[in-house]
């Protein structure tokens, strides 16, 4: 393999390598579990020459054979060192990490890791294997090799193996942070390759896709010009363009041609080729040029992604912190500390309960609001009263006639029958009792639901404590609902006593009369003058009496409905919020008296401890990941380009 100049390498050590190392370190910390990291994913159909390209880049033999050879995503991390005699390998997967110093062991180590991850055979796994190679003969580069796309399942493979592989590939190529390195043989129709089609589906403009043409020595005579056109980006356009390489073929492998010898052969092939020599001269050919191109692209992509990556880490940290706050700290083991912890839990719940029922912010969660729903229910109650008033007005004329016939006794015509007035008022008020009780039931259910939600977010991970809180909420709900129902029924019994202050009633009556006069003035006058309320024209003087009765009924209903519009919600709020919250607080405080029962109430859900541990691990990963990003953000991409052009 051609070696990069020492100056180039020195600049890597100072600037480029830290950039790539930062992303590699984030990946090793497990940050990729939380968000996507900049990467180069290598994809290709089976037998596309993908493994040969990676072998040539890394300088070590990788697993080969027919069918699916790459059965797990393989992170190939190459670190260039100044020490010409040093070669070191490290393979990591699951909880295993192994160092070795013989490059010949790479293939065996990868196969062992794949067997452990995906099982012996030909299955695949989505778990990542990481292979780190430190050598003077490799570029500073990190690639992720993905399984080759299979068209037909072979013996021992599930029928949907092709779909499994494509699903795995899509996990990587859909990410905006991924550069798609698509490997395509020169001797096939590039437009029909599934690897390029998948990349185009997720990256239609080709901004994240780089094409690699392999096996130029197998091109049919007469088609070389098409290959040149593809590399020149004149057939299927990719923003990042194309490169062309020639790696060891199967015969050369069997003849034990070394990778260094293969690189020399590749260089000679392109220099002397009648059609491809200009690609060599233009810098589009050979593995060393590909390594340089990939390094430039990766560093560019990393630098471009850094601001967004920093923002994502900050967002994820905030989300993690919020989740940790929701789960809270686990209970301490020391008895006195456990009691203090329990007291704090109950006190915080009681304070949040008070805040919830008075419309203040709840500390344990930001989206638990009670009063907006109560306001809606009470608005519905007010609407019921308005509709009842409208229907009352419509039936007044008919009902007054009926009451006059049925109840008017010795009074002379023209006198208002107070008994008729009271009867009509009472009948209308009775119709409102059932809707009021329904409003009570609805609000009671809303309050119960909110109280339970508060308990759930206050006692996350403590099932026994949550259970007893729910039991108390249910009991108090039934009790206070029953008391509120009794108060409402009493209220409606009192409403059957027709009463209002003289001043209040007189004002309401005057308002009703003024409104009626305005309506009559606006009504078109008939050519033949008729009484103002023709429906009351009974051929007697009773129409004046009935007109007065109608005004009195409307006036009183207005007063009664306003009274009920406020009184019913006040009774409900008093019993279901204020009294229920106070009783629940007292009940919860009584738990503190049973010190022997504290341990049982603080038994934590087995899953919660694990979730808290996972969140703490994520928080640690993300915090550690932010430290090197700050420095890299200070270095602009122009700095990197200047280095690479030296």
UniProtKB/Swiss-Prot annotation:
Q: Where is this region: G5 motif?
A: 246-249
The organism's place on the tree of life at top rank = Eukaryota
Binding-site positions, GTP: 44-51, 145-149, 214-217
User: Is this entry keyworded Metal-binding?
Assistant: no
Q: Where would you find the membrane-spanning parts of this chain?
A: none
Alphabetically sorted, this entry's keywords are:
Cytoplasm, GTP-binding, Nucleotide-binding
One Gene Ontology cellular component annotation? plasma membrane
Annotated region G3 motif: the residues are 145-148
Q: What induces it?
A: By interferons.
Q: Which GO terms describe its molecular function?
A: GTP binding; GTPase activity; microtubule binding
CDD domains attached here? Answer: DLP_1
Pfam families named in the record: Dynamin_M, Dynamin_N, GED
Q: Where is this region: G2 motif?
A: 69-71
Q: Where is the GED domain?
A: 546-637
Q: Where is this protein chiefly located?
A: cytoplasm
Q: What is this protein called?
A: Interferon-induced GTP-binding protein MxA
State the organism of origin. Danio rerio
Q: Which gene encodes it?
A: mxa
């Amino acid at each position: 393999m051609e070696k990069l100049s020492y100056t180039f390498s020195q600049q890597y050590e100072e600037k480029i390598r830290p950039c790539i190392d930062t992303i590699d370190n984030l990946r090793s910390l497990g940050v990729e579990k939380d968000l996507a990291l900049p990467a180069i994913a290598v994809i290709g159909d089976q037998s596309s020459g993908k493994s040969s390209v990676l072998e040539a880049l890394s300088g070590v033999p990788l697993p080969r054979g027919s069918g699916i050879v790459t059965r797990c995503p393989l992170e190939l991390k190459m670190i260039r060192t100044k020490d010409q005699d040093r070669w070191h390998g490290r393979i990591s997967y699951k909880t295993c990490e192994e160092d070795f110093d013989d490059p010949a062991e790479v293939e065996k180590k990868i196969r062992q890791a794949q067997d452990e991850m995906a099982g012996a055979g030909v299955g695949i796994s989505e778990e990542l294997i990481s292979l780190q190679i430190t050598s003077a003969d490799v570029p500073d580069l990190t690639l992720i090799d993905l399984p080759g796309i299979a068209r037909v399942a072979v013996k021992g493979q599930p029928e949907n193996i092709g779909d499994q592989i494509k699903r795995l590939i899509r996990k990587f190529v859909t990410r905006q942070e991924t550069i798609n390195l698509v490997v395509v043989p020169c001797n096939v129709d590039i437009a029909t390759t599934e690897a390029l089609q998948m990349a185009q589906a997720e990256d239609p403009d080709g901004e994240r896709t780089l094409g690699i043409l392999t096996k130029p020595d197998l091109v049919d005579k007469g088609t070389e010009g098409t290959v040149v056109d593809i590399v020149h980006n004149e057939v299927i356009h990719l923003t990042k363009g194309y490169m062309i390489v020639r790696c060891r073929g199967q015969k050369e492998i069997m003849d034990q041609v070394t990778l260094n010898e293969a690189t020399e052969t590749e260089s000679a092939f392109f220099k002397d080729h009648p059609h491809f020599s200009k690609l060599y001269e233009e810098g589009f050919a050979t593995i060393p040029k590909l390594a340089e191109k990939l390094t430039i692209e990766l560093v560019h992509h990393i630098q471009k992604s850094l601001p967004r990556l920093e923002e994502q880490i900050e967002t994820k940290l905030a989300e993690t912190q919020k989740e940790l706050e929701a789960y809270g700290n686990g209970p301490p083991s020391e008895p006195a500390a456990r009691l203090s912890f329990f007291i704090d839990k109950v006190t915080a719940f009681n304070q949040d309960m008070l805040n919830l029922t008075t419309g203040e912010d709840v500390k344990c969660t930001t989206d638990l609001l009670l009063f907006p729903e109560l306001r809606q229910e009470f608005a519905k109650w007010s609407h019921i009263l308005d509709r009842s008033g409208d229907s009352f007005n419509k039936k007044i004329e008919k009902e007054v006639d009926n009451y006059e016939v049925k109840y008017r006794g010795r009074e002379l015509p023209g006198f208002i029958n107070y008994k008729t007035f009271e009867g009509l008022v009472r009948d209308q008020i009775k119709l409102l009792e059932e809707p009021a009780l329904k409003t009570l039931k609805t609000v009671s259910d809303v309050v119960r639901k909110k109280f339970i939600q508060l308990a759930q977010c206050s006692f996350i991970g403590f099932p026994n404590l949550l259970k007893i809180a729910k039991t108390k909420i249910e009991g108090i709900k039934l009790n206070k609902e029953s008391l509120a129902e009794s108060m409402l029924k009493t209220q409606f019994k009192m409403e059957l006593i027709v009463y209002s202050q003289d001043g209040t009633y007189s004002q309401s009556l005057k308002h009703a009369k003024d409104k009626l006069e305005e309506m009559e003035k606006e009504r078109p006058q008939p050519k033949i003058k008729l009484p103002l309320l023709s429906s009351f024209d009974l051929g007697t003087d009773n129409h004046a009496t009935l007109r007065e009765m109608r005004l009195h009924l409307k006036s009183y209903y207005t007063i009664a409905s306003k009274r009920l519009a406020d009184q019913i919600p006040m009774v409900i709020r008093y019993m279901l919020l204020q009294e229920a919250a106070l009783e629940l607080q007292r009940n919860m405080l009584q738990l503190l008296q049973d010190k022997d029962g504290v341990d049982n109430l603080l038994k934590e859900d087995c899953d919660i401890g694990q979730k808290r541990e996972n969140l703490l691990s994520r928080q640690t990963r993300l915090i550690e990941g932010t430290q090197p990003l700050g420095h890299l953000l200070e270095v602009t991409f122009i700095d990197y380009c200047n280095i690479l052009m030296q």
